[in-house]
């Protein structure tokens, strides 16, 4: 089954009173992923004794900082492209965002919101991170509609058809790579990997986390965040090796010859750092187990030490 993105990247496109009303598939999918992730997080929040409104209150801040972080991260490595017209940085319709930047933005929003709402940082992150990964899994389908995040040519039956105008050199040469050339759907690989990762995190939390019977609890607050970092980064590292439109230290596309794939470098660092943090978190826990306030407020009180 060949995967072939639609020619039109717009879900909605019309003019109202002379003003263009446009909704791209990419944006709609990102928003859908964020809302579904928030639904998951709100259910997890209730199970841990938090009020679900905390999730929805943080959502807008998370979206703003996530998108800003994704754009800033991308622009930082592609500044030569934007330098002639710096205002183009704000034109997101031209493409150019990076998942690692979005993750940084989401984590920053958690720091800000937990301080504002008086929530225990590490435990609240454990509530949210399965939702982060679920949003990433859904959001990757935006790459399908944008015809991006694809890999090397393949003869697999579920290869991805990419129109020539969306291909990076030399794959836009139709003499060597005809229109029928199929490419690895790396967006799909990462989407499936992330979805499996969501299942693993939920299983570990239910089996060994705070909601497990006391005798089975093995996870400290913050562990799910670090496991999320390891799971996501492990998949991203090997999938990134298949891509031909990677963000490289010296630009986008090709094999990154003479340079490095930024996502692979960040993934390696994240795996090591998260592994060390899990070790340290079990030597001396970063936070104690939160308890519910006796006044009926569902927001837990941290016993941090």
Curated annotation (Swiss-Prot):
HAMAP family: Lgt. One of its GO terms (biological process) is lipoprotein biosynthetic process. This is Phosphatidylglycerol--prolipoprotein diacylglyceryl transferase. The chain crosses the membrane at residues 10-30, 59-79, 92-112, 182-202, 260-280. Pathway: Protein modification; lipoprotein biosynthesis (diacylglyceryl transfer). It is found in: Cell membrane. It comes from Chloroflexus aggregans (strain MD-66 / DSM 9485). Belongs to the Lgt family. Its EC number is 2.5.1.145. Its main location: membrane. The gene is lgt. InterPro entries: Lgt. A 1,2-diacyl-sn-glycero-3-phospho-(1'-sn-glycerol) binds at residue 140. GO terms for molecular function: phosphatidylglycerol-prolipoprotein diacylglyceryl transferase activity. One of its GO terms (cellular component) is plasma membrane. It comes from the Bacteria. It holds the Pfam family LGT. Catalyzes the transfer of the diacylglyceryl group from phosphatidylglycerol to the sulfhydryl group of the N-terminal cysteine of a prolipoprotein, the first step in the formation of mature lipoproteins. Keywords: Cell membrane, Membrane, Transferase, Transmembrane, Transmembrane helix. It is a multi-pass membrane protein. NCBIfam families: lgt.
């Amino acid at each position: 089954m060949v995967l072939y993105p639609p020619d039109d990247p717009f879900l909605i496109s019309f003019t109202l009173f002379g003003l263009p009303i446009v909704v791209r598939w990419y944006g709609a999918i990102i928003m859908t992923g964020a809302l579904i992730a928030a639904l998951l997080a709100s259910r997890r929040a209730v199970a841990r004794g938090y009020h679900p409104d905390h999730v929805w209150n943080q959502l807008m801040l998370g979206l703003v900082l996530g998108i800003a972080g994704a754009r800033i991260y991308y622009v930082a490595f592609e500044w030569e492209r934007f330098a002639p017209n710096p205002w183009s940085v704000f034109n997101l319709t031209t493409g150019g965002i990076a998942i690692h930047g979005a993750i940084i933005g989401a984590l920053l929003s958690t720091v800000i919101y937990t301080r504002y709402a008086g929530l225990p940082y590490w435990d609240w992150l454990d509530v949210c991170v399965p939702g982060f990964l679920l949003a990433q899994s859904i959001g990757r389908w935006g790459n399908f509609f944008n015809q991006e995040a694809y890999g090397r040519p393949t003869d697999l039956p579920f290869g991805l058809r990419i129109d020539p105008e969306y291909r990076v050199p030399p794959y836009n040469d139709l003499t060597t790579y005809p229109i029928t050339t199929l490419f690895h759907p790396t967006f799909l690989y990462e989407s499936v990997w992330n979805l499996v990762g969501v299942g693993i995190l939920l299983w570990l939390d239910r089996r060994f986390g705070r909601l497990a019977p006391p005798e089975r609890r093995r996870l400290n607050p913050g562990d799910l965040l670090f496991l999320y970092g390891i799971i996501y980064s492990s998949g991203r590292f090997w999938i990134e090796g298949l891509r031909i439109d990677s963000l490289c230290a010296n630009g986008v596309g090709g094999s990154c010859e003479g340079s490095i794939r930024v996502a692979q470098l960040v993934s390696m660092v994240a795996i090591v750092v998260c592994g060390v943090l899990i070790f340290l978190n079990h030597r001396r826990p970063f936070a104690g187990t939160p308890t519910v306030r006796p006044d009926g407020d569902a927001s837990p009180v941290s016993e941090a030490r």
